Amino acid sequence: MTPADLAELLRGTAAKVLAERGLDVSVLPETLTVERPRNPEHGDYATNVAMQVAKKVGTNPRELAGWLADALTAAEGIDSADIAGPGFLNIRLAADAQGAIVAKILEAGAAFGAGHTLDGKKINLEFVSANPTGPIHLGGTRWAAVGDALGRILSTQGAAVTREYYFNDHGAQIDRFSRSLIAAAKGEPAPEDGYAGAYIADIAAQVQQQRPDVLDLPAGEQQEVFRSIGVDLMFAHIKRTLHEFGVDFDVYFHENSLFESGAVEKAVETLKDSGNLFQEDGAWWLKSTDFGDDKDRVVIKSDGNAAYIAGDIAYFQDKRSRGFDLCIYMLGADHHGYIGRLKAAAAAFGDDPDTVEVLIGQMVNLVRDGVAVKMSKRAGTVITLDDLVEAIGVDASRYAMIRSSVDSSIDIDLELWTSTGNENPVYYVQYAHARLSAIARNAADLGIAVTDPDFSLLIAEQEGDLIRTLGEYPRVVTSAANLREPHRIARYLEELAGAYHRFYGACRILPQGDEEVGPLHIARLALCDASRQVLANGLALLGVSAPEQM
């Protein structure tokens, strides 16, 4: 019996108890919640439903809890239900009902944890979207890992997810990039507002290989060649780096296409016609304060050029025209102002601002010998995704980026993430999977078949703790999807690995010496198989490998 199964049983029982006493059943929440007590001596699960409902039906919480306890104790799969405090219920499952979680996992396999909370939802998930002016830095690496994991998690809950990369190939930064390439090709210092670093010299050399005559061209043509070929080369490198990191996109959307197609101009005219733009000092402004933004925003500057928000507005309209119910933007720490402006732009078109969701990620620091390594793309000292992977590997890089909430900054300690001990979170989780895989191999070598396990034999404290932890997995995945928090999966996997390691230390799994294979061995092997499956499922959602041996 999973927590969801127990919650369903609890609601049905509560409805019956209220109805039998002529009390209002409609006061019951649609879904009841059961939690694991911090102290396992208090039971397997606890609920405060009696305290939630008692006042609404005119009774005492402890009295209602007593009615519920009597009814639950008589229910199949419940060992006991005890009242605590002002009306809490502490519930213990029967051993066979608790063990049924294991059977459910083995039956579902890779699908265990999948749900339907987002069925029919069409989501556009835009992340990374780094400018094609340099390699992906640590901030972009965080979004690559978190965004990819979030896409996987949303998909498990039934959403149709499109992973999208917004290719910023329009604007002043591309001009600065091309001028930086020209300077490098000529052996001159980078422009003051340009980009520097070895990668600039490398790309400049590649442009010259493709166009040996480029420096002989007139200045305007010269810059266009460096711009066109340089951006293509840089973006090819970005895509290759992301692919090697396990991140691929369904759509690469070019910002420039919004201007070439007239989409920006059309969006601006629509806003003018609706009265949501006003002119002041020669510029056109969006009345974004009318829609909750902290200030009005310039859309068309006084020189007639479009401000950056003009492209954002047209881009959002393009997404909605493609039928997306929800547009999630994953942006860097310096983009807090975008939340209000994007929602205001949606509202100005008569759209629901809740179709826009913005996640803001905080800074990432790489720590070497206890000192944070500074990074600056323009100064040429950028720490890149490639650098991080070279230092600690793909799995550790992804896991390190995902395991913390995106609204907190993180320090990645090279020594920690390359260590082979329990202090390294990804090693700790992967080692649990590898150890479980070794047990499965050893059982196969002994000719042991895991058939018809008797889960009622799994009564040891460590067995119960492991089973209950396994049962939490679907709820964790659902929460991670609904709250857009992939770190919940990582933290859960660490908890599960800990529960497994404690079980492994306390319970002998395989027969030793001349000992015959008994029902308890079979039940414990089934529990191991279920644990291995859930670890593999969770790691897959994070895009991290589940090694068979280490």
UniProtKB/Swiss-Prot annotation:
Keyword annotations for this protein, in alphabetical order, are:
Aminoacyl-tRNA synthetase, ATP-binding, Cytoplasm, Ligase, Nucleotide-binding, Protein biosynthesis
Catalysed reaction per UniProt?
tRNA(Arg) + L-arginine + ATP = L-arginyl-tRNA(Arg) + AMP + diphosphate
Its main subcellular localisation, reduced to a broad class, is: cytoplasm
* Enzyme Commission code: 6.1.1.19
> Any idea where this protein resides?
Cytoplasm
- Where do we find the motif 'HIGH' region here? 130-140
Query: Which GO biological process categories is it annotated with?
Result: arginyl-tRNA aminoacylation
Task: Give me the Gene Ontology terms describing cellular component.
Answer: cytoplasm
| Molecular function terms from GO | arginine-tRNA ligase activity; ATP binding
Q: Which InterPro entries match?
A: aa-tRNA-synth_I_CS (IPR001412), Arg-tRNA-ligase (IPR001278), Arg-tRNA-synth_N (IPR005148), Arg-tRNA-synth_N_sf (IPR036695), ArgRS_core (IPR035684), DALR_anticod-bd (IPR008909), Rossmann-like_a/b/a_fold (IPR014729), tRNAsynth_Ia_anticodon-bd (IPR009080)
One short Pfam family name for this protein? Answer: tRNA-synt_1d
**Quaternary structure?**
Monomer.
Which PANTHER family does UniProt cross-reference here? ARGININE--TRNA LIGASE, CYTOPLASMIC, ARGINYL-TRNA SYNTHETASE
> What does the sequence similarity comment in the record state about its family?
Belongs to the class-I aminoacyl-tRNA synthetase family.
Name of the protein described by the UniProt record? Arginine--tRNA ligase
Q: Which organism is it from?
A: Rhodococcus opacus (strain B4)
Name the encoding gene, please. Answer: argS
